[in-house]
Amino acid sequence: MQIKEPLRVGIGGPVGSGKTALTLALCQRLRNVYNIAVVTNDIYTREDAEFLTRNEALAPERIIGVETGGCPHTAIREDASMNLEAVAQLSERFNPLDIVFVESGGDNLAATFSPELSDLTIYVIDVAAGEKIPRKGGPGITKSDLLVINKIDLAPMVGASLEVMEKDARRMRGERPFIFTNLKRGQGLEDIVGFIEKQGLML
């Protein structure tokens, strides 16, 4: 039996930016529409996988937690074999799988997904890290298919200007899209779903 190749969506970003919150929200929004699964990456635990299971993102057998050890961005870039194996397992188990979300371990602004592992990349940063984050650049900011600027509700508390962040994101990314979100309240989620469907599934 031929195994369908799913759309692989890489979700990256610094620790605490909202990667797992985005993965959870996307699973809850899309699980009744598409056949989906998740691969998470943690250095020494399966904490993100357990969080998603606990919050009933998907059935537990649809979530594989990869323990990367050492440097988390190596597992999504230079040596993606563990992640590729997890994607292959899920593709076989739930054939025909539509989408696999691959969430990276907490990484820095220089981390990117291997093209072997991800068809579409979403990079999540958060307003609480300061308005200067978009202009710091790095491949996640400049080269990802979609930049998500999360936790916009915190802007007044940390003295961050969304206007400045928007201007810097536009300057750093050129034509590449970015979306402001408050994932706790679901704000911006539909725009992300629309992007995945249009760019990845060609709907």
Swiss-Prot record:
Localization: Cytoplasm
Biological source species: Methylobacillus flagellatus (strain ATCC 51484 / DSM 6875 / VKM B-1610 / KT)
Gene Ontology biological process terms from the UniProt entry: urea catabolic process
Annotated InterPro entries: CobW/HypB/UreG_nucleotide-bd (IPR003495), P-loop_NTPase (IPR027417), UreG (IPR004400)
Oligomer and partners: Homodimer. UreD, UreF and UreG form a complex that acts as a GTP-hydrolysis-dependent molecular chaperone, activating the urease apoprotein by helping to assemble the nickel containing metallocenter of UreC. The UreE protein probably delivers the nickel.
Binding site for GTP: G13, P14, V15, G16, S17, G18, K19, T20
Domain of life where this protein originates: Bacteria
The family this protein is said to belong to: Belongs to the SIMIBI class G3E GTPase family. UreG subfamily.
Protein name: Urease accessory protein UreG
CDD domains noted in UniProt: UreG
GO-annotated molecular function: GTP binding; GTPase activity; nickel cation binding
Cellular-component GO terms for this entry: cytoplasm
Cited Pfam families: cobW (PF02492)
Swiss-Prot/TrEMBL keywords: Chaperone, Cytoplasm, GTP-binding, Nickel insertion, Nucleotide-binding
Protein role: Facilitates the functional incorporation of the urease nickel metallocenter. This process requires GTP hydrolysis, probably effectuated by UreG.
NCBIfam families: ureG
